[in-house]
Amino acid sequence: MQQGDGTEAQVTWEDQQNINRFGRLNNRFHELTDEIRLAKEANENLEDAGNELILCDEDVVRFQIGEVFAHMPMDDVEARLEQMKEDAAKKLERLEEEKESILAQMAELKKILYGKFKDAINLEED
């Protein structure tokens, strides 16, 4: 591998493992970005459903379970909706934490790899 100053840097097994690990982390980072976007949309949908439920004046409402709508008492639907909101918020928080952890690991690997290979390696996204 050719460095900017004209000397060759040998890629050791450990270097290759770090490069591979960076690639896996980068892939997971992009997956998490998509999952976070979907989780935020789900949170918004649950919030909208809660708002619609507040406006509803019926004692029995239709509640979607999988692909089927079931008629359920309003109180049960409110309780289920609140539980779903809590679960969705926890999931979003967990995904955000994992994303931050991955970013920290990627930053550490960048420091190591750029320290050794300088301009001969590009870990930035275009």
From Swiss-Prot:
It holds the Pfam family Prefoldin_2. GO terms for molecular function: unfolded protein binding. GO terms for biological process: protein folding; response to cold. It comes from the Eukaryota. The keyword Chaperone applies. Keywords: Chaperone. Gene3D superfamilies: 1.10.287.370. GO terms for cellular component: cytoplasm; prefoldin complex. Disulfide bonds: none annotated. Heterohexamer of two PFD-alpha type and four PFD-beta type subunits. Binds specifically to cytosolic chaperonin (c-CPN) and transfers target proteins to it. Binds to nascent polypeptide chain and promotes folding in an environment in which there are many competing pathways for nonnative proteins. Belongs to the prefoldin subunit beta family. This is Probable prefoldin subunit 4.
